[in-house]
Swiss-Prot record:
Keywords: Actin-binding, Kelch repeat, Repeat, Ubl conjugation pathway. GO terms for molecular function: actin binding. PANTHER family: KELCH PROTEIN, KELCH-LIKE PROTEIN 20. Probable substrate-specific adapter of an E3 ubiquitin-protein ligase complex which mediates the ubiquitination and subsequent proteasomal degradation of target proteins. May have a role in synapse differentiation and growth. This is Kelch-like protein diablo. Gene3D superfamilies: 1.25.40.420, Kelch-type beta propeller, Potassium Channel Kv1.1, Chain A. Residues 143-245 form the BACK domain. Kelch repeats lie at residues 292-338, 340-386, 387-433, 435-480, 482-527, 528-574. It holds the Pfam family Kelch_1. Pathway: Protein modification; protein ubiquitination. GO terms for biological process: negative regulation of synaptic assembly at neuromuscular junction; protein ubiquitination. SMART domains: BACK (SM00875), BTB (SM00225), Kelch (SM00612).
Length: 589
C-alpha cells in the first residue's frame, strides 16, 4: 500500500449549511390550508356582515394596521371577532388572501375599492401595484378622475404622474367631459402650471372659456379668478384684441378688463417689460415642443465672430438671426425675462465688459444694458431668482473669482461674495435655489472642484468634486441633475460626461459623447439635452448631438451654419409669427 498523507491539523467537525427556497412557499401554503379549514384561527374579521377567518400572527406580520390593533391596548386586541367599517368586503378578502398567498389580481373592477383598503391596512406593496395599474390606464379621457382619486388617497407618485400626463396631453384633455366637470380649484391647479403643454396661450384661454360656458350661471362668478392664470401678455395682439377683449363676459367684468389692459401694456411697451415681470409673463415650458436653441458668437476660422443662429428641433433647421454688434468669443449667455443676454467675451483684440440683449419678437439686439464691473471672457452666466449672474472668467490680467449680478429693474450690476477659487472657463448651473460653479481653470491647471452659492446667505460652499478635471466644459440642468460634458483636462479635449445628484451630493458617469468637445455649449431644449459645437483637438466643430437618458446614448443630429468654439447657448420659447411684425400703438385699443 502507498503512504497515506495525514494532516497534523486537528480534525474540524463536518458542516453543511442549507437554506431552503421551498420552505417559505410551503409554509404559507399550509397556513392558508389551515385558514380555509378554519383550523387554529384565532380571529374573525367582520366586514359588512362577511366573516373572514384568519390568524392574528399572519395579519400582524403583513399589515402594520393589524399589528397595532392586535399587539396594543386596543379593545380589539382582546376580541375574537373584529368589525371593520368603511371598507369593501371583497377588497378585504382579496387583501387577506394576499397575506397568505403572495398573489393578487388588480383589475378595473376592483382597483377603486382595493386601493383605499390597502391604504387603510398600510399594505404598501399593494398600494404600489394599484397605482402602477392606474398609471397604465391613463388616457386623456380619464386622467383627471385618476388624479382626483390619487389626491383623495394621498398617492403622491400617482398624483405626480397623473399631473404630468394631464399637462403633457392638455390639448386632448381639454376636449374631455372630465375637464368640463372640473371644480374651479382643480381647474386653477392645472392651468397655473408652467409645464402645461400648449402650442400657444390661446389654447388655455379657449379651454377656460369652454369650461365657463358649460355652466355660465354658476361659474361666471369665478371668471376673474380663473383668467388671472391665463398668461394674456403672451397672447398674440390679434387674439388679445379680437377675441379676448371683445368677449362679452370678459368686458362685463372689471377685474377681467384690468387683466386685458395689463397684457396690452406689456405688448406695447417692450422697454418696460423688465418692470412688468410676473407669473403671467413667464412662458410655459411644454414638453417636446415650442422651444428653440440659440448659438451665439464664438471662435471660428481664427477669429471671434458676431453671428447668431437659431435651431428649431421640430424642423431640425438652423437659421441665421440678427448678429450682435460686437464679435464675442468666450461669451456668457443666459435668458432672462424672455430676452437673451450676451455678456462679455473677447472680440479678437480686447476683453469686453459690454453686454447685448436680444429680443426674439423683433429680431433685434440692443446695447442699453449696463456693463459688468470687470471685463470678462470665458465667463459663466446664469439666472437665479430674477437676477443675471456673471461668474469668474479672466480679464486679460488674471483669472477671476469675482461674482456680480444684474438687476434688470435697476439696470445695474452689484458684486456678491466671491468664489473660494479663481475660475476661467467655468460652467455654471442653477438647481434647487443654488448657483453652482463647476470646474474651469485657476489659471494654472484645470479643476474638478465644484462650489455653490446660496443667495440667502451670500456665501459659497464646496460640494463634491467631479471625477474628471474639466475647463471650458458644457453644463446644464436636466431632469434634476447637473450634467457636465466635454471640456479639456491637463492633456486633451474630452468626450466624457458625468452628472451630479444634489440629493446624494455625488457625481456619476454617463456615456461619452460621440466627439471630443472643448468650448462646448450644453442646453436642454423641449426636454432633450443638446451639446453644441466646440473643438475636438484638431478642428472647430459645427456638429451638434443629443443625449437620450433612456438609452444612455448620444447621437448626432445636424450641423450649424458656423463652426463655433467658446460660443454661448440659450433656450427660449419660439416666437409667434404674428409677433415678428410689430404693430403700431394705436392699433391696440
Amino acid at each position: 500500500m502507498g503512504d497515506v498523507l495525514i494532516s497534523d491539523r486537528p480534525p474540524s467537525p463536518a458542516r453543511l449549511s442549507h437554506t431552503s427556497e421551498k420552505h417559505p412557499r410551503v409554509t404559507l401554503t399550509e397556513l392558508n390550508v389551515l385558514r380555509r379549514h378554519r383550523e387554529l384561527c384565532d380571529v374573525v374579521i367582520n366586514v359588512s356582515g362577511r366573516k373572514i377567518f384568519a390568524h392574528r400572527v399572519i395579519l400582524s406580520a403583513c399589515s402594520p394596521y393589524f399589528r397595532a390593533m392586535f399587539t396594543g391596548e386596543l379593545e380589539e386586541s382582546r376580541q375574537t371577532e373584529v368589525t371593520i367599517r368603511d371598507i369593501d368586503e371583497n377588497a378585504m378578502e382579496l387583501l387577506i388572501d394576499f397575506c397568505y398567498t403572495s398573489h393578487i389580481v388588480v383589475e378595473e373592477s376592483n382597483v377603486q375599492t382595493l386601493l383605499p383598503a390597502a391604504c387603510l391596512l398600510q399594505l404598501a406593496e399593494i398600494q404600489d401595484i394599484c397605482c402602477e395599474f392606474l398609471k397604465r390606464q391613463l388616457d386623456p379621457t380619464n386622467c383627471l378622475g385618476i388624479r382626483a382619486f390619487a389626491d383623495t388617497h394621498s398617492c403622491r407618485e400617482l398624483l405626480r404622474i397623473a399631473d404630468k400626463f394631464t399637462q403633457h396631453n392638455f390639448q386632448e384633455v381639454m376636449e374631455s367631459e372630465e375637464f368640463l366637470l372640473l371644480p374651479v380649484g382643480q381647474l386653477v391647479d392645472i392651468i397655473c402650471s408652467d409645464e402645461l403643454n400648449v402650442r400657444s396661450e390661446e389654447q388655455v384661454f379657449n379651454a377656460v372659456m369652454a369650461w365657463l360656458k358649460y355652466n355660465v350661471a354658476e361659474r361666471r362668478q369665478h371668471l376673474a379668478q380663473v383668467l388671472q392664470h391665463v398668461r394674456m401678455p403672451l397672447l398674440s395682439p390679434k387674439f388679445l384684441v379680437g377675441t379676448v377683449g371683445s368677449d362679452l363676459l370678459v368686458r362685463s367684468d372689471e377685474a377681467c378688463r384690468d387683466l386685458v389692459d395689463e397684457a396690452k401694456n406689456y405688448l406695447l411697451l417692450p422697454q418696460e417689460r423688465p418692470l412688468m415681470q410676473g407669473p403671467r409673463t413667464r412662458p410655459r415650458k411644454p414638453t417636446r415642443r415650442g422651444e428653440v436653441l440659440f448659438a451665439v458668437g464664438g471662435w471660428c476660422s481664427g477669429d471671434a465672430i458676431a453671428s447668431v443662429e437659431r435651431f428649431d428641433p421640430e424642423t431640425a433647421d438652423w437659421k441665421m438671426v440678427a448678429p450682435m454688434s460686437k464679435r464675442r468669443c468666450g461669451v456668457g449667455v443666459a435668458v432672462l425675462n424672455d430676452l437673451l443676454y450676451a455678456v462679455g467675451g473677447h472680440d479678437g483684440q480686447s476683453y469686453l465688459n459690454s453686454i447685448e440683449r436680444y429680443d426674439p419678437q423683433t429680431n433685434q439686439w440692443s446695447c442699453d444694458v449696463a456693463p459688468t464691473t470687470s471685463c470678462r471672457t470665458s465667463v459663466g452666466v446664469a439666472v437665479l431668482d430674477g437676477f443675471l449672474y456673471a461668474v469668474g472668467g479672466q480679464d486679460g490680467v488674471q483669472c477671476l473669482n469675482h461674482v456680480e449680478r444684474y438687476d434688470p429693474k435697476e439696470n445695474k450690476w452689484s458684486k456678491v461674495a466671491p468664489m473660494t477659487t479663481r475660475r476661467l472657463g467655468v460652467a455654471v448651473a442653477v438647481l434647487g435655489g443654488y448657483l453652482y460653479a463647476i470646474g474651469g481653470s485657476d489659471g494654472q491647471c484645470p479643476l474638478n472642484t465644484v462650489e455653490r452659492y446660496d443667495p440667502r446667505q451670500n456665501k459659497w460652499c464646496a460640494v463634491s468634486p467631479m471625477s474628471t478635471r474639466r475647463k471650458h466644459l458644457g453644463c446644464a440642468v436636466f431632469n434634476n441633475f447637473i450634467y457636465a460634458v466635454g471640456g479639456r483636462d491637463d492633456c486633451m479635449e474630452l468626450s466624457s460626461a458625468e452628472r451630479y445628484n444634489p440629493h446624494t451630493n455625488s457625481w456619476s458617469p454617463i456615456v461619452a459623447m460621440t466627439s471630443r468637445r472643448s468650448g462646448v455649449g450644453l442646453a436642454v431644449v423641449n426636454g432633450q439635452l443638446y451639446a453644441v459645437g466646440g473643438f475636438d483637438g484638431t478642428a472647430y466643430l459645427k456638429t451638434i448631438e443629443v443625449y437620450d437618458p433612456e438609452t444612455n446614448q448620444w447621437r448626432l443630429c445636424g450641423c450649424m451654419n458656423y463652426r463655433r468654439l467658446g460660443g454661448g447657448v440659450g433656450v427660449m420659447r419660439a416666437p409667434q409669427t404674428e409677433n415678428y411684425m410689430w404693430i403700431r400703438k394705436d392699433s391696440v385699443v
